[in-house]
């Protein structure tokens, strides 16, 4: 029923011209925004700096992805009265951040008085000229997927300060481009362009994060689905913003596998999103195998104070068959090869949790409910024609990290061990590609 609810929720609001007001329970409502200076919102502007040559923080500076950090000067600020310590910030469209169809972009924070910080990148599809299934609005309040639930005892990040980054521009948090719309059905509705502002949105959220949580000891950068893919480039910018923190990257269902041998696919996405210029000059060969995983290699090699987790099912239906349109066995082959290379090169800093679930096609394990993919409040989801509805409903499975286990350890406990850098408990765990009879399929 969860999967049916997710699909119906998306389809019910798939018209990008449709807005839904909130209700008495505190959901978001359309209202006129009142912008104030950062000072009035108890924030401060970001001051760009030039990092030391050869430092990990220098990577983002040299790649040119820091350009939006000092552009944010005003926000519309609101306090979520339902939950203590939670606030939201909406940004001025003129300063860069926005959703794909021109709606406002917002982030939410939770202050728990912690020395640790969770940055969570929401999932929600992707949109390019050949395929578009994407969320196109950003909620102003923080949802409650498992990873953001401060009351869930098993949540290893429950006590962390948190920043929630909605996802609404279809560019995997990497875009910086405006592309003319080429879908006749959307042109008929007056939608003439796709605005990719993932980098500006990510930057705006990090400005808020830095202002409120200036010097955390540990930063967990986590993302699910599109947010998982988003962590790959976001890690560079997060390191620039927090040069001294332990950086713990948790990639859930967006581990960097794409189309094996099809470099043109990756290049097309980068070009359309306007992100090709952010690829480091000495990483020009990073995508020759058709995957994005070499960029993870590039980053970890240059940032010894970062470690990363790859969490996925063997046959993730949403990534393999829906978005990549590749055979699930080809996906599993590439997943095995690409992640093995990373683990063998960084055995203590890159580890996997590859599970089976009920069907082996599960998608995401940090969420447990759809709010981590589509947010809450006014939602707009653009759906492509010809989607295999039966396949989607039959294969979509949102796992729960407090219940999913391999052997004796749950994913939640495994992630807790990762935070503590307990290399014994944070093992490299993979179930067989086909579950054994009466065995633990994860």
Q: For the regions a protein language model found, what residue spans apply to each?
A:
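Extracellular calcium-associated, cysteine-rich motifs in secreted modular proteins
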Residues: 22-24
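C-terminal motif of bacterial Sec signal peptides marking the signal peptidase cleavage site
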Residues: 8-10
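C-terminal His-loop and adjacent cap/lid subdomain of alpha/beta-hydrolase
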Residues: 12-17, 26-442
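Sec-dependent signal peptide recognition
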Residues: 1-4
């Amino acid at each position: 029923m969860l999967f049916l609810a997710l699909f119906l929720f998306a389809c019910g609001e798939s018209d990008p011209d449709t807005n839904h007001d909130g209700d008495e329970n505190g959901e978001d409502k359309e209202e006129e925004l009142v912008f104030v200076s950062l000072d009035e919102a108890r924030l401060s502007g970001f001051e760009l700096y030039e990092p030391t040559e050869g430092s990990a923080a220098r990577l983002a500076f040299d790649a040119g992805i820091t350009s939006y950090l000092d552009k944010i000067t005003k926000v519309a600020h609101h306090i979520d009265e339902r939950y203590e310590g939670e606030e939201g910030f909406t940004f001025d469209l003129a300063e860069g951040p926005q959703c794909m169809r021109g709606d406002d972009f917002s982030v939410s924070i939770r202050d728990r008085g912690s020395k640790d910080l969770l940055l969570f990148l929401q999932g929600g599809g992707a949109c390019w000229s050949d395929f578009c299934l994407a969320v196109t609005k950003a909620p102003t309040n923080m949802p409650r997927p498992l990873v953001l639930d401060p009351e869930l005892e098993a949540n290893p990040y429950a006590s962390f300060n948190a920043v929630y980054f909605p996802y609404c521009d279809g560019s995997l948090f990497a875009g910086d481009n405006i592309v003319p719309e080429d879908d006749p059905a959307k042109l008929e509705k007056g939608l003439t362009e796709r605005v990719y502002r993932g980098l500006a949105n990510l930057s705006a959220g990090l400005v808020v994060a830095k202002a409120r949580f200036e010097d955390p000891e540990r930063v967990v950068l986590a993302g699910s689905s599109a947010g998982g893919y988003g962590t790959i480039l976001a890690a560079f910018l997060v390191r620039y913003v927090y040069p001294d923190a332990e950086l713990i990257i948790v990639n859930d269902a967006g581990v960097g596998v794409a189309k094996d041998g099809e470099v043109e696919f990756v290049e097309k996405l980068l070009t359309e999103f306007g992100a090709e210029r952010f690829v480091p000059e000495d990483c020009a060969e990073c995508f020759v195998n058709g995957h994005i995983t070499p960029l993870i290699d590039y980053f970890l090699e240059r940032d010894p104070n970062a470690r990363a987790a790859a969490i996925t099912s063997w046959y993730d239906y949403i990534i393999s068959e829906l978005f990549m349109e590749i055979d699930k066995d080809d996906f599993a082959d590439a997943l095995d090869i690409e992640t093995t290379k990373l683990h063998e090169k960084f055995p203590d800093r890159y580890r996997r949790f590859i599970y089976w679930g009920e069907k082996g096609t599960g998608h995401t394990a940090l969420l447990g409910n759809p709010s981590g993919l589509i947010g809450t409040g006014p939602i707009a989801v653009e759906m492509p024609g010809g989607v295999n509805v039966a396949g989607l409903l039959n294969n979509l499975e949102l796992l729960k990290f407090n219940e999913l286990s391999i052997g004796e350890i749950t994913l939640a406990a495994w992630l807790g061990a990762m935070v503590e850098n307990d290399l014994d408990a944070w093992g490299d765990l993979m179930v067989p590609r086909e579950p054994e009879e009466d065995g633990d399929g994860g």
